[in-house]
């Protein structure tokens, strides 16, 4: 099992390029199921979750070809509508194949999902929406079986809560349903707009993605299309925090700063200098950041996927900050590991109070989930001494060669394989 060893205390300097978005790539690759024939998706990051998605699609009979950051998906060879537990258990997004298979073939059977162990994350909104589109849903023996003998029919669906996966799922299913579907209280994340752009490239009629009301005029069929995935805003935000926590000065290529307004404003409040010239974002960290409070919210609010990284920054800030997590329960699992660095953090309910310390000290720590692992990397970069991070397979689920990119910015970081 691999681990990371970091000798901290180095200011990051130089340029780095952001990879394609994991959270956009997953639903886009799954949406290829809707169109018989071969779609070519580019700017796909080389990550464990992407490999899992490719295996999932292959298990359905699709033909997959991968070369570096390009994936060719031929969904014309799909020969089964069942996604089994052994693949679905490792990644929550796998459940998104339920709707596209149902819409195209009239039936699907998918195991209940796994993935990061963050709170309940139920799929009730997904199933409620599919029922509204005319599906019969049965839950038995850990599987969801959906049947629509006469095909799906457009419907008005109002989500009880903002759900990114639910919005993506029903947008895909409604794309080839009969008639118009309206999704109300839809999630507004940029990845949803990216998926809609891909669906429209295939011939779908989706309007309003990126707002809280999405209209989908169903079409009889979709055709395969070529598409380039958007850049990963969470990776970009992680590099912004890395520059800030090390007092570094870096340039980030390939990111869209407008996708990170909430983070950008909070970083600037903390004393970080951020400029955007010709699509290149320069981030210059202060000698010591100022304490800033944050509350995670659905997009365009502060992203829950950036909460852990921002907490790492606040560990070395001047003053005390309060970090409130309003999206997922159990998303403070990184706190106990940050304490090993010498951080001063107390948790009460969904809020953590972070009293900044002048210096963190390197420590042996263990990653608990994807974004928590990134937070530990940031703490290790800022800490004096050596940090050893175990269980970095979590990190590999969402960051493409992050240690190589950080080393390119001057970090003393290496991956070590253990027997």
UniProtKB/Swiss-Prot annotation:
It is found in: Cytoplasm. It comes from the Bacteria. Phosphoenolpyruvate binds at residues 22-23. One of its GO terms (cellular component) is cytoplasm. The keyword Metal-binding does not apply. One of its GO terms (molecular function) is UDP-N-acetylglucosamine 1-carboxyvinyltransferase activity. The keyword Cell cycle applies. This is UDP-N-acetylglucosamine 1-carboxyvinyltransferase. The gene is murA.
């Amino acid at each position: 099992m691999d681990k990371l060893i970091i000798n901290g205390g180095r200011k990051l300097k130089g340029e780095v390029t952001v990879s394609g978005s994991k959270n956009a790539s997953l639903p886009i690759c799954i949406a290829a199921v809707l169109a018989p024939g071969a779609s070519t998706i580019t700017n796909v990051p080389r990550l464990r979750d992407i490999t899992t998605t490719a295996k999932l699609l292959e298990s359905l009979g699709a033909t997959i070809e991968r070369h570096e950051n390009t994936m060719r998906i031929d969904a014309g060879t799909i020969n089964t509508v069942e996604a089994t537990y052994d693949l679905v258990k490792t990644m929550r997004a796998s459940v998104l194949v339920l709707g596209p298979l149902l819409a195209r073939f009239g039936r699907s059977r998918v195991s209940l999902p796994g993935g990061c162990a963050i709170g309940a994350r139920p799929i009730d909104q997904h199933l409620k929406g599919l029922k509204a589109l005319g599906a019969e849903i049965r839950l038995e023996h850990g599987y969801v079986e959906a049947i629509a003998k006469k095909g799906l029919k457009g419907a008005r669906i109002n989500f009880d809560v903002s759900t990114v996966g639910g919005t993506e799922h029903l947008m895909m299913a409604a794309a080839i349903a009969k008639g118009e579907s309206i999704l109300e209280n839809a999630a507004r994340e940029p990845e949803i707009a990216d998926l809609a752009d891909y669906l429209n490239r295939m011939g779908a009629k989706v309007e309003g993605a990126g707002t809280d009301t999405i209209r989908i005029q169903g079409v009889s069929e979709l055709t395969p299309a070529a598409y380039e995935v958007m850049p990963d805003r969470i990776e970009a935000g992680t590099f912004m925090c890395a520059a800030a926590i090390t007092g570094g000065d870096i340039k980030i290529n390939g990111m869209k700063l407008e996708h990170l307004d909430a983070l950008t404003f909070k970083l600037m409040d903390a004393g970080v200098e951020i400029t955007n010239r010709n699509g290149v974002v320069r981030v210059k960290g202060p000698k010591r950041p100022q304490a800033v409070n944050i509350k995670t919210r659905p997009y365009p609010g502060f992203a829950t996927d950036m909460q852990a990284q921002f907490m790492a920054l606040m560990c070395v800030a001047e003053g005390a900050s309060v970090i409130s997590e309003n999206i997922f329960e159990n998303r403070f699992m990184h706190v106990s590991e940050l304490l090993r660095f010498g951080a001063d953090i107390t948790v009460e309910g969904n809020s953590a109070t972070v009293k900044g310390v002048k210096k963190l000290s390197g420590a042996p720590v263990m990653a608990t989930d994807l974004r928590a692992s990134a937070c530990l990397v940031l703490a290790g970069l800022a800490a004096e001494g050596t940090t050893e991070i175990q269980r970095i397979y979590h990190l590999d689920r969402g960051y493409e060669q992050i240690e190589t990119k950080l080393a390119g910015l001057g970090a003393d970081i290496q991956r070590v394989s253990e027997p």
